[in-house]
Curated annotation (Swiss-Prot):
Protein name: Probable tRNA-dihydrouridine synthase
Gene name for this UniProt entry: dus
Organism: Mycobacterium leprae (strain TN)
Annotated catalysed reactions: a 5,6-dihydrouridine in tRNA + NAD(+) = a uridine in tRNA + NADH + H(+); a 5,6-dihydrouridine in tRNA + NADP(+) = a uridine in tRNA + NADPH + H(+)
A GO molecular-function descriptor: tRNA binding
Keyword NADP: yes
PANTHER family, alphabetized: TRNA-DIHYDROURIDINE(47) SYNTHASE [NAD(P)(+)]-LIKE
Active site: C115
Length: 384
């Protein structure tokens, strides 16, 4: 499962990940649907093959915010269409989930209770919310109730808890299971850890022991296919969620597909092959956003794509300022395409940072059974 990541998992990146997830043979030429074997086609869109769009707020969706609606763009052949909702209010959750169901906006709803960012937690949202267990249960129940009678599953993603003194994942898992969630996913870090340190896979194993009737997915520190297999072996979880590990590496899903089906791993791409993937990503972004915004967006991806490769500071700096597709093409032609995939490109990528105190609303920890909806927690400046 591709984890929703703000500013990353839009339709363009999901397209690349989906294509690689159904690769047959050549890593750079994924098999289109009409060329997949019946077995390959049947595996596309299973719980281990979901590619979730970047998070949108339930309130912004209900208000039909233009930016939010554009963020929920899916490719014509994308199936199932997975949408993640950020929400703090049962009533708004119900309205948003009902809108998704009634208008056919998506085939799967994931719910975000894992964001550790201060602007979110200080208002009681994201990773702070599961501490309010009654409110958390009401929100999950609202989404499930809104999709009753449809084939739209509701899944729930959360963290271990606020910090080492306030773990919430076991309660959250049991509550989500009781309220009808189809699966739960645990990012095995606390909000205080943010993206730093090491994911505590033992907590995934504990959650799996507590949640028995629905799948439990694990998230955290999966950077290659062997990590995914190791997590499942160690924790007993039913599947994995890939986040930062696939930044600049959409072909990771080809490696995962091979590992889970017992096929030989595809050869890692050369620098020339990576350049071709960057070109395709850039073209998809321009088609989605237009050239100006598309090229501004590709810049961060280029840094991830070239992670560990020798490229030189001058060329990297030029790529970090690229403005047009033609310029992108010229700059990529300057790379040495024969360079093999380097060992330095393997391992952690993306933001890591340091642990930090978690900002919370006043008296947030006083009563975990308080189901008062936090004020202003569902208002995002981005429209997402």
């Amino acid at each position: 499962m591709l984890a929703p990541m703000a500013g990353v998992t839009n339709v363009t990146f999901r397209t690349l990940c989906r294509e690689f997830g159904s690769t047959r043979g050549n890593l750079l030429r994924p098999a289109p649907p009409h060329l997949r074997s019946p077995l390959e086609q049947s595996q596309v869109g299973t719980i281990s093959g979901l590619y979730v769009c970047e998070m949108v707020t339930a309130r912004a969706l209900v208000e039909r915010n233009a930016v939010t609606i554009h963020m929920t763009t899916f490719a014509p052949d994308e199936s199932p269409r997975s949408l993640q909702l950020y929400t703090v209010d049962p009533a708004t959750t119900y309205t948003a989930a009902k809108m998704v169901a009634d208008e056919g906006l998506a085939d799967h709803i994931d719910m975000n209770f894992g964001c550790p960012m201060p602007k979110v937690t200080r208002r009681g949202g994201g990773a702070a919310l599961p501490y309010k267990r009654r409110l958390f249960g009401q929100i999950v129940a609202a989404a499930v109730r809104a999709t009753e009678g449809t084939k739209i599953p509701v899944t729930v993603k959360f963290r271990i808890g606020i910090d080492d003194e306030h773990h919430t994942h076991l309660d959250a898992g049991r509550i989500a299971e009781a309220e009808g969630a189809a699966a739960v996913a645990l990012h095995a870090r606390t909000a205080a850890q943010r993206y730093s340190g090491t994911a505590d896979w033992a907590q995934i194993a504990q959650l799996k022991q507590q949640v028995r009737t629905i799948p439990v997915l694990g998230n955290g520190d999966i950077y290659d296919a062997s990590d995914a297999l190791a997590m499942m072996a160690v924790t007993g979880c039913d599947g994995v969620v890939i986040g930062r590990g696939c930044l600049g590496r959409p072909w990771l899903f080809a490696e995962l597909s091979a590992a889970f089906t017992g096929r030989p791993a595809p050869a890692p791409p050369t620098l020339g092959e990576v350049a071709e993937i960057v070109r395709r990503h850039g073209k998809l972004l321009v088609a989605h956003f237009g050239e100006d915004k598309g090229m501004r967006d590709i810049r961060k991806h280029i840094a991830w794509y070239l992670h560990g490769f020798p490229a030189g500071s001058e060329l990297r700096n030029a790529l970090a300022l690229v403005k047009t597709l033609d310029e992108l093409d010229c700059l990529l032609n300057r790379l040495d395409g024969a360079v093999p995939f380097p060992d330095a490109a393997i391992g952690p990528r993306g933001r890591q940072g340091s642990p930090a105190w978690v900002a919370l609303p006043d008296s947030w920890l006083t009563d975990p059974d308080d189901c008062t909806v936090p004020i202003g927690a569902d208002i995002m400046e981005s429209g997402g």
